[in-house]
Amino acid sequence: MTGSSPNILILGIGNLLWADEGFGVRCVELLNERYRFPDGVRLMDGGTQGIYLVQHVQQADCLIVFDAVDYGLAPGTLKVVRDDEVPRFMGAKRMSLHQTGFQDVLALAAFTGAYPRELLLVGVQPAELEDFGGSLREPVRAQLEPALAIALAFLAERGVLATPREGDAEQLAPAQLALGRYEAERPAEELAYRHGDIRFIAQPGREDD
């Protein structure tokens, strides 16, 4: 720890554009909107930054991660994993096809000798990951509040208390990606193709040039 005030990183990872992949980021957004935290606590939308997250992990004495994790459980199941057990649950999923998985981020931080003393993963079993432009499915959305409660209790046990926020918070992500606006402005199914890039998918009755 660095003195009496540890550096705590609360990190949401995942891709907002792929339905339940956005769970981790939505958790951090809600914490940021609702609460203020003491100095030394940082909230971060980690998105799909991959290896670029290493420096932030290295600086943390305590790391809390929210994410959609394939535990092999029923959709919407919330599972908490701590410390040395965390990396093995983060290994199967890459942040994108071309980026580093979070397991690799943790491994690199450990290799450099700058690794959090405490690590908490609050993960939910996703229901849908293939709906491009989609939002959280109900079983996953229902776990937002319980996930926040777990993180707040974890912090409180360490004497770190969040206080209700008065006024608007500085946004962690572009305003158009905020949950309410993202869902309200989503095109109807008949107006948007959600299963890949239609330019590269063979269309019935259309011959190649």
Swiss-Prot record:
The keyword Metal-binding applies. Coiled coil: none annotated. Keywords: Aspartyl protease, Hydrolase, Metal-binding, Nickel, Protease. CDD domains: H2MP_MemB-H2up. Transmembrane segments: none annotated. GO terms for biological process: protein processing. Belongs to the peptidase A31 family. NCBIfam families: hupD, hydrog_prot. This is Hydrogenase expression/formation protein HupM. It comes from Azotobacter chroococcum mcd 1. The gene is hupM.
